[in-house]
Each structure stands twice: as structure tokens, then as C-alpha cells.
Amino acid sequence: MSAGEFAVRPVGPADIPGLCALLNEIIRIGGTTAMETPMTIESFLDTFFRSQIQISFMVAEASGGDLLGFQVLAAHEKLPEDWADIATFARVGSQTSGVGSALFAETLTQARRFELAAINATIRADNAGGLAYYDRMGFVTYKVDEKVPLKSGHRVDRISKGYRVISD
């Protein structure tokens, strides 16, 4: 499937069950998200809508209606006011090329609209795909939190990468 066979658009209420299922599959497999507990629709809404100030929430949808991935850009209390935190999730096993790039292009448009200085992405060090994705998008590592404990007791580094939205 090519970029012409999917569209990126803002998330709507009807998307929530499908996005929750997509995220739960990623959580179930493990190793690519800091989230470790599957979500109910209620906890999905709490996490992505009720507990943060959203700037952008985009979904990639195949021409047949399948949800291929989503990207959230939100304010974060641990970041400067003119920064936002990004999270990206793609359907497991999807062979669709260009979803991540298309999502980021739309998210970046919103970041510029809100005059953000930078975007932060925090990725588990064992998430090679996530690290490579943010590198491809132009993010640069600026901080490493070492040996962050998981629920299992296993420890993993978390890498923070930044993307400058506006230039000096």
C-alpha cells in the first residue's frame, strides 16, 4: 500500500475503539512502548484526552477504513512551555510505507501553527524501530535516562530526542 492509499486526518470519536485496539496489540507484544498495561477505552481516553493538553492527534487511515497508526502531540509538565511531547504508534505488521512520515508532516504543521520551539520524543533504548523512525524525522538525542525500571523489574534506558520546530 502506498501513500496514495491512505489519508492522514484528525482523530474523531468513532476512531477511539480502533486506536485503543491498535495500541493494545503493541502493548501486548511489548518492547516498543513505555506503556506496559493494556488499556480500556476509558483509560485510553484518560491517557490521551483527559490528562493532557492536546495540540494535535492525527490518524492514518487506509482507503478501506483500517487504522494504520496515530500520532499525538501534547503539552507536558516536564517540558518548557514552548515544547510538546510526541508519541507515535503504528499497526503491528502493517506493510504500508510512508505512514510515519505522513503523520509527522501533519503533526509538524500543527506544531508550527502553535508556534512551538521544539518537539520531544522519549523512546525506550530497546526500541530500535522507534529510535530509527525519530532519527529519520530529524530528531536529535539530547538526554538519556539510564536504567528506568519496568513493571517486570527489568531496567531500560529512555532516550529523549528533540526536533527544532523553529530556527533561531
Label for each model-derived stretch:
Residues 21-38:
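Helix-loop element at the rim of GNAT/NAT acetyltransferase active sites that forms part
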Residues 118-124, 135, 140-157:
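Conserved catalytic-core motifs of GNAT/GCN5-like acyltransferases
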